[in-house]
């Protein structure tokens, strides 16, 4: 297991066909974007995530504790993902969490992981002297008067006046070489009464920040940059009768993110684009610098952004529950069963942002009397407060009829008929809805020859009423050559399988707005959903 706080990063290079792209190192926000066989559609190109048989968000997947997971499988081709119809165009990630097994005594597992997070590559930056030489060459090539005299170049080179002619490596000034990450997990699994099986898991993750000067930040605001996450999961299986199995799954997640008022991505953007000669970190009197003899002040001091621009706190509470019942219907025909899933998820978010500006001054040298000259650049303000709260709710109903039977020890037939409906709502808005039916039939002979057909008829309300549903068929065939007696293989080859498939899948993530089909286009429009002509 990779010691990562975000599950998506643990999959990098582990599954064929899965591409992971990590774009941030901010604690709690370092998830990778996932793509199966690259970008395949317009709009959203992320795969559908299915956890224990039910669709979930990629955030739910990202924040899973790796110790809860039994297996992760990706469905890449149209045949395997067509059951998901209108949501399957970008492939499917199927996650199965751990469940209890029959054992005489409970199995208790405790895991501790400590990790060091370190940027593997940062941009190389010029020094102020190297920058000045480039400006000198540019002026010479353009036939312009050189902006830096030889005397000024010597001062910059020697660093004899770091306040008027600063040379600041902002990466070294703002970022630490590494930060710590801690993970703790405890699992308990077992059985009772011969009918009950359980798996219970609890975990805690803490990510530190790569930003320096956290003692100053904590002194100013009484908070510390961090990411904390608590995970809980309970999977219980009950054999109510010899024909009826009941499954009760509960899961929860509590997250807290704290950081400077300026978002981490903005901090990184600032230090990436800031010139080494733009300003000193501090002036001779200890105030924050703004501008220099080489550049007039027009941007905020990165040190002040990290330590004195305010702070944010983000709390996320997620609770989900799934109730499932599976009943064997062998009295109708052997291998037939019916299964019902009902799942509910509630996500509560509370974001608080408190921002302020800070004092900074442009040091312009000394006057004739030797007094330092300072020009105010920014003035400290009171903390402003912005609060936002919202709730997301998901309900999912799934009804399945399954058939799985083997005849004469070589002919295996399996089939499934499935109907489902998903509702997602945020605060008091009308819920988003998905619904559809799908079926699958598969045959294999002697585990050598495989045939499969899938049909999906799924709908999304992101489309006009008469165009919400689509028909998604698929077919596949496979042949395990390595099991043929007439083929002799060397010992180092264990499996050769040919497989071909064809199918149709869809994608309804075509835009950020909900009912794109009623977007208005009006001359002179300025409101959202209108187009400005001319």
Cite the ranges covered by each PLM segment.
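Active-site-proximal polar cores
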Residues: 359-360
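A generic structural signal for short coil/turn motifs at secondary-structure boundaries
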Residues: 58-59, 81-83, 174, 209-211, ...
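Conserved residues at the C-terminal ends of beta-strands
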Residues: 75
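Extracellular/periplasmic, surface-exposed regions of secreted and cell-surface proteins
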Residues: 46, 182, 235-244, 250-254, ...
């Amino acid at each position: 297991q990779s010691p990562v706080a975000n599950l998506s990063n643990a999959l990098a290079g582990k599954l064929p066909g899965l591409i992971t792209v990590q774009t941030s190192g901010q604690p709690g926000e370092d998830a990778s974007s996932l793509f199966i066989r690259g970008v395949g559609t317009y709009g959203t190109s992320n795969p559908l995530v299915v956890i224990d048989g039910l669709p979930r968000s990629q955030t739910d997947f990202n924040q899973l504790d790796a110790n809860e997971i039994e297996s992760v499988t990706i469905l890449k081709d149209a045949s395997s993902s067509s059951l998901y119809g209108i949501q399957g165009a970008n492939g499917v990630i199927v996650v199965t969490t751990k469940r209890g097994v029959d054992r005489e005594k409970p199995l208790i597992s405790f895991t501790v992981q400590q990790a060091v997070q370190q940027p593997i590559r940062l941009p190389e930056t010029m020094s102020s002297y190297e920058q000045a030489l480039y400006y000198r060459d540019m002026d010479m090539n353009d036939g312009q008067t050189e902006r830096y005299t030889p005397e000024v170049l010597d001062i910059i080179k020697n660093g004899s006046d770091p306040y008027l002619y600063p040379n600041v490596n902002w990466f070294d000034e703002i970022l630490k070489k590494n930060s710590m990450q801690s993970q703790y997990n405890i699992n308990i699994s077992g059985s009772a009464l011969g009918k009950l099986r359980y798996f219970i898991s609890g975990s805690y993750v803490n990510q530190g920040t790569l930003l320096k000067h956290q003692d100053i930040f904590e002194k100013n605001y009484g908070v510390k940059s961090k990411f904390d996450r608590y995970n809980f999961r309970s999977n219980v299986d009950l054999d109510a009768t010899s024909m009826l199995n009941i499954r009760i799954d509960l899961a929860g997640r509590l997250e807290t993110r704290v950081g400077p008022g300026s978002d981490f991505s903005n901090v990184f953007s600032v230090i990436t684009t800031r010139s080494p000669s733009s300003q000193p970190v501090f002036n001779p009197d200890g105030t924050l610098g703004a501008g220099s003899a080489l550049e007039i002040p027009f941007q905020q001091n990165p040190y002040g952004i990290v330590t004195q621009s305010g702070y944010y706190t983000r709390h996320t509470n997620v609770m989900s529950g799934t109730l499932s019942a599976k009943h064997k219907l062998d009295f109708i025909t052997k291998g037939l069963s019916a299964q019902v899933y009902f799942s509910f998820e509630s996500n509560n978010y509370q974001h608080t942002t408190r921002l302020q500006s800070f004092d900074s001054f442009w040091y312009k040298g000394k006057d004739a009397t030797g007094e330092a000259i300072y020009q105010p650049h920014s003035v400290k303000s009171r903390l402003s407060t912005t609060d936002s709260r919202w709730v997301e709710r998901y309900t999912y109903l799934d009804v399945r009829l399954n058939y799985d039977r083997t005849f004469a020890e070589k002919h295996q037939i399996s089939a499934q008929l499935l109907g489902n409906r998903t509702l997602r709502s945020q605060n008091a808005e009308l819920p988003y809805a998905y619904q559809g039916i799908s079926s699958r039939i598969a045959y294999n002979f002697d585990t050598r020859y495989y045939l499969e057909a899938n049909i999906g008829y799924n709908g999304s309300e992101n489309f006009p009423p008469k165009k919400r549903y689509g028909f998604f068929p698929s077919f596949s065939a496979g042949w395990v050559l390595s099991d043929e007696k007439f083929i002799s293989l060397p010992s180092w080859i264990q499996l050769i399988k040919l497989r071909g498939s064809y199918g149709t899948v869809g994608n309804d993530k075509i835009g950020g707005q909900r009912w794109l089909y009623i977007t208005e286009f009006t001359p002179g429009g300025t409101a959202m959903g209108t187009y400005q002509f001319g």
